Structure formats: C-alpha cells, structure tokens
Amino acid sequence: MNTFTTTAYNTLGEAQETETQTDSWTATEICLDFSMLYGYAETLDAWGRHAGEYGDRPAALGQRAY
C-alpha cells in the first residue's frame, strides 16, 4: 500500500500542517484545500517522490527537483 503525505507551507516556506493518506485522489483534494488555506502545498509519495502541488512555491523552499 502506498501512502501520500501532503504538507502545507506559508509564504515564508514554514510547514504549517501535514496529513497522510493512502488514497491518491484524497491526497490531491487535501493538497488543493491546504493551498487555499496556506498558499502552497505539495504531496509526496512514500518514497519521497513528487506526487503533486498547488499554489505558489515559496522561494525559501528552493527549486523543486523532479
């Protein structure tokens, strides 16, 4: 079973909230909700691979390497 961890960040790049799901679609919906609340959110799978993001990535987080 795969897990998806979504982390929300404020405009300073500070993590505000994290949630883990086993369903990729639920993780996508949570990512969108978090981005609306905090400005940016990204979802990673159990191996740390990028699975999605919404919002404007804060400069403090640096450039994402895919």
Task: Locate each region found by the language model.
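Short, mixed-charge low-complexity intrinsically disordered segments
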Residues: 36-66
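Surface-exposed loop/edge segments in extracytoplasmic proteins
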Residues: 13-19, 50-51
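A short, charged, amphipathic alpha-helix used as a generic interaction element across diverse proteins
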Residues: 12, 22-47
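Secondary-structure transition/turn motif
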Residues: 9-10, 21, 53-57
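Short aromatic-glycine-(Arg/Gly/Cys) micro-motifs in beta-strand/loop hairpins
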Residues: 1-15
